[in-house]
Amino acid sequence: MILEIVQTGDPVLRRVGRELSVEEIKSSAIQRLIESMRDTMRAAPGVGLAAPQIGESIQLAVIEDRSEYIQDASAEQLEERNRSVIEFHVIVNPKITLLGDASAEFFEGCLSIEGYQAVVPRAYRVRVQCLNEKAEPLIIDAEGWYARILQHEIDHLNGNLYIDRMYSRTFTANENLAS
């Protein structure tokens, strides 16, 4: 089921999401929500979707960077961003640690701020400790584009948007970026 993606200005995007219990994660309601979030993310299309973006103030996000999303990028762009295919997965109740001092600055967009992008500085490497969709512990060490996606989605779970971190003078409509 495709869900409606809420847009900036909706108060749910500024709330810290509630953590889910193991029982909640395993419930049929949350499992159905995960499926709907996956379908919604793919339909948008996007590389991540956090529960607050569909109006649910809980600590849950889905992530996937499919081959068809990156097929038009040049080898240079993929290398510069350290971007590759990321299989579909779920993060629940994540805790993030920034690793090292290295950072990267690239344009980011958001399904909840349709039609705009801006340059956002992000840590180059992160470690995320969370639970997966089966409520099993998961540790993710990520760098490059994957680290950026994780930071973006975890920001959503904590009531933050990329516009809180962006270089404001780079904020632009997508059609202006393309030209």
Report each predicted region and the residues it spans:
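Active-site rim/adjacent substrate-binding subdomains
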Residues: 1-151, 156-179
